[in-house]
């Protein structure tokens, strides 16, 4: 089911899709993505696809993944930290050899700028009212309710789509500020918001981020917990679908939270979920890690 096959079909009206499938961190694992779509019997004229970010990097075929996703009709995509890293590299805001990556094919592609333009118009949060679900890459910090989270994510979308997106991206990296304050302004405000939605794993009850720890939930530093353990499912009243945290292996201890990163780029598996039925589907990794 490649991009050409989808492009050859008449674009479907997906306002009322038969099924909505959300896929975990693809990270350039194009072969596994296609195998997963075969497993779920995805029909682009009847079903809708969504992705919880980290579309690229670590796996071998990031370029193919981006071209395929761009060909889809109205995919539900949110950005992850690796996608933001690609934007920074792609626009020449950081030397290509600053970190190890597998993005060389994207950076050298003739349609690079077109792909980057498409990517930076993707949001950090998607709220699907009809399915009572929120898609986000890393999670939602405890000090914000769903409405506040959506509004803060829109601040990042405005920066990415606006005329000063290069300045925003150039100054995006960093762990500070790690504590949210309502009076944060400028790049500090945007950096905290972006880190919360794309990098957070552990935090405290007030949303102080620990961006250094990456282990399992029982390895949290003192006073910190996994972000989802601070949230109130009754207050949220939605399913929160997220990726980013491969160490969870797709397991979340909190009600109505669905972890989808099952470490495909690390040699494990790629996982998706049917948002209506909550049925999960997985395929094993076939691609050797390239970094």
From Swiss-Prot:
GO molecular function, a single term: bis(5'-nucleosyl)-tetraphosphatase (symmetrical) activity
Q: Which SUPFAM superfamilies match?
A: Metallo-dependent phosphatases
Reaction catalysed?
A: P(1),P(4)-bis(5'-adenosyl) tetraphosphate + H2O = 2 ADP + 2 H(+)
The record's keywords, sorted A to Z, are: Hydrolase
Write down the top EC class of this protein. Answer: hydrolase
Q: What is its EC number?
A: 3.6.1.41
Q: Give the superkingdom in one word.
A: Bacteria
Q: What's the stated role of this polypeptide?
A: Hydrolyzes diadenosine 5',5'''-P1,P4-tetraphosphate to yield ADP.
**Cross-referenced PANTHER family, in alphabetical order?**
CYTOCHROME C5 (PTHR40942:SF4), PTHR40942
**Per the similarity annotation, which family is this?**
Belongs to the Ap4A hydrolase family.
The protein depicted here goes by the name Bis(5'-nucleosyl)-tetraphosphatase, symmetrical
Source organism of the structure: Coxiella burnetii (strain CbuK_Q154) (Coxiella burnetii (strain Q154))
Question: What is this organism's lineage?
Answer: Bacteria, Pseudomonadati, Pseudomonadota, Gammaproteobacteria, Legionellales
The encoding gene: apaH
């Amino acid at each position: 089911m490649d991009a050409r096959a989808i492009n050859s079909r008449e674009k479907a009206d997906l306002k009322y899709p038969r099924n909505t499938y959300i896929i975990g961190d693809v990270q350039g694992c194009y072969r596994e993505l296609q195998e997963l779509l075969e497993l779920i019997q995805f029909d682009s004229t009847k079903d809708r696809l969504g992705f919880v970010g980290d579309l690229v990097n670590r796996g071998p075929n990031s370029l193919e993944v981006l071209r395929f996703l761009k060909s889809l009709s109205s995919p539900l995509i949110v950005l992850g930290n690796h996608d933001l890293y690609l934007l920074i590299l792609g626009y020449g805001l950081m030397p290509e050899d600053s970190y190890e990556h597998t993005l060389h094919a994207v950076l050298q592609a003739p349609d690079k700028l077109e792909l980057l333009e498409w990517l930076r118009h993707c949001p950090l949060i998607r709220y699907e009212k009809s399915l009572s679900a929120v898609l986000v890459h890393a999670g939602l910090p405890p000090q914000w309710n769903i409405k506040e989270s959506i509004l803060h994510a829109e601040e990042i979308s405005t920066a990415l789509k606006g005329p000063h997106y290069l300045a925003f991206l150039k100054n995006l990296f960093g762990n500070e500020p790690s504590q949210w304050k309502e009076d944060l302004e400028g790049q500090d405000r945007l950096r905290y918001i972006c880190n919360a939605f794309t990098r957070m794993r552990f935090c405290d009850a007030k949303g102080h981020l620990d961006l250094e720890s990456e282990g399992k939930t029982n390895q949290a530093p003192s006073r910190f917990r996994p972000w989802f353990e601070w949230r109130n499912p009754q207050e949220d009243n939605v399913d929160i679908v997220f990726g980013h945290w491969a160490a969870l292996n797709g397991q979340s201890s909190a009600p109505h939270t669905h972890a989808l990163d099952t470490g495909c780029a690390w040699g494990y598996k790629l996982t998706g979920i049917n948002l209506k039925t909550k049925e999960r589907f997985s395929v094993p990794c076939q691609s050797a890690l390239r970094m």
